[in-house]
Amino acid sequence: MRFKDSHTLTASYLSLITQAAVNNLAPLLLLTFRAQWGLSLEQLTLLTTLNFSVQLVVDLLSAKAVDKIGYRPCMIAAHVLAAAGLAGLAALPAIFGSAYAGLMAAVVLYAMGGGLIEVLISPIVEACPTPRKEAAMSLLHSFYCWG
């Protein structure tokens, strides 16, 4: 199957839904984490802090690496990491000796994916030959709200 620009745009739009899940799912579950595993407020806030800290580090480090590796492998890696981290929210607390360590590992995984998506997605949409780039970029960023 030969992929067209419309496939790239659709995949890009769906990537922002993944980005929204990465940033918003765990905070929605903080009370559940507290009730189920008895985590303190400090531990819960550290999960969100860890997410955004890892994303920022990945943003900084990936800017140059993406040019060497390529956009496609990096986008695939981003989604694999995000999916592994989101699935890890359910599985890793039971696998690790400490539920908190499992949650932190899951957060690091999905934050790495989220950081890559953040760096890659806008340039990909910008590079697509669309007649109305402004509309495509606006639609792209609206998908974050849909996630």
Predicted feature residues:
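Primarily marks hydrophobic transmembrane alpha-helices of the MFS/SLC 12-helix fold
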Residues: 72-75, 103
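Glycine-rich segments within core transmembrane alpha-helices of 12-TM secondary carriers
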Residues: 134-147
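Intracellular juxtamembrane helix-capping segments at the cytosolic ends
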Residues: 116-129
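Central cavity-lining transmembrane alpha-helices of secondary-active solute carriers
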Residues: 46-64
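C-terminal ends and interior cores of transmembrane alpha-helices
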Residues: 80-97
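MFS transmembrane alpha-helix packing/gate-lining sites
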Residues: 22, 54-58, 113, 147
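Hydrophobic core of transmembrane alpha-helices in multi-pass small-molecule transporters
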Residues: 99-116
